[in-house]
């Protein structure tokens, strides 16, 4: 059930082209962010930082392979090789870009609301940042996801917080729309 969002992040990981030993980061701690941590960890980074807005996501981030966790209001470094942004806000995109060293690679996967203030083009040019975007998953990303999952390097189950029978669809919708930070993915079983 969670391979589709994982495939979108596989597309981001492919575009990021993170090499073993590079310093990598993920901005965002939702489902996409946790998949990004797992994909980047599989590439043997020297350091894997996760930046989010909620302290309660640190344990899960570390479980998936993060070596450091910070909230975006803490002091953040500016010398990472690769950053994948998954939060879907303009401020997350700006935070992600600020984490990069000159010549670093940024992959944006989140979609901010219409009219959001974007990245500073002068900053992108002067710092020679390489910027990629992802929307959906092409066939190579799906293949990569299935291989990584089959190899045991991708674990979506900790992201599922509730499993309900299909007959409880309305309860599932209520849970998802509740805004409760303890509600992750809700899985309906037929």
Regions found by a protein language model. Name each.
Residues 139-190:
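C-terminal hydrophobic helical "lid"/dimerization subdomain
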Residues 17-19, 88, 101-102, 154, ...:
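Short conserved AdoMet
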């Amino acid at each position: 059930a969670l391979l589709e969002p994982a495939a979108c992040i596989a597309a981001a990981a492919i575009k990021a082209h993170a090499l073993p030993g590079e310093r990598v980061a993920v901005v965002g701690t939702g489902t996409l962010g946790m998949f990004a941590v797992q994909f980047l960890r599989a590439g043997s980074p020297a350091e894997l930082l996760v930046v989010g807005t909620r302290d309660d996501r640190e344990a899960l981030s570390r479980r998936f392979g993060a070596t450091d966790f910070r909230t975006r209001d803490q002091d953040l470094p500016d010398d990472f090789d690769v950053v994948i942004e998954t939060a879907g806000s303009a401020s997350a995109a700006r935070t992600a870009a600020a984490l990069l060293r000159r010549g670093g690679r940024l992959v944006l996967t989140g979609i901010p609301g219409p009219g959001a203030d974007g990245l500073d083009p002068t900053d992108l040019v002067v710092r020679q940042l390489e910027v990629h975007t992802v929307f959906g998953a092409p066939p190579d990303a799906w293949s990569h996801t299935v291989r990584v999952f089959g190899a045991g390097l991708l674990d979506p189950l900790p992201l599922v917080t509730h499993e309900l029978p299909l007959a409880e669809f309305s309860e599932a919708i209520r849970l998802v729309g509740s805004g409760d930070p303890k509600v992750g993915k809700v899985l309906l079983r037929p």
